[in-house]
Amino acid sequence: MYAIIETGGKQIKVEAGQEIYVEKLAGEVGDVVTFDKVLFVGGDSAKVGVPFVDGATVTAKVEKQGRAKKLTVYKYKPKKNYHKKQGHRQPYTKLTIDAINA
């Protein structure tokens, strides 16, 4: 059985036992997170939500809070002596999917 959930403005296909990386969620390591925005549940009998499947939830456990590798943003304007260098590290949350309840 699998499901498609919405979190952080993105849609992610998940299965039980899978590890996923999502946009930063509030919670400490070991906390349980429940996703109510389930768009689709697949398996023996598929359920399509309009826009969400009624009564369907996905539970996951927070494994890690972290930050991605650094991205360097460099801007400049030619012939004007304007240079700007800036770094960015996107925060993320690593989850392990425990169960899909449909």
Swiss-Prot record:
GO terms for biological process: translation. InterPro entries: bL21-like, bL21-like_sf, Ribosomal_bL21, Ribosomal_bL21_CS. GO terms for cellular component: cytoplasm; ribonucleoprotein complex; ribosome. It holds the Pfam family Ribosomal_L21p. GO terms for molecular function: rRNA binding; structural constituent of ribosome. Keywords: Ribonucleoprotein, Ribosomal protein, RNA-binding, rRNA-binding. Part of the 50S ribosomal subunit. Contacts protein L20. This protein binds to 23S rRNA in the presence of protein L20. Belongs to the bacterial ribosomal protein bL21 family. This is Large ribosomal subunit protein bL21. The lineage of its organism: Bacteria, Bacillati, Bacillota, Bacilli, Bacillales. The gene is rplU.
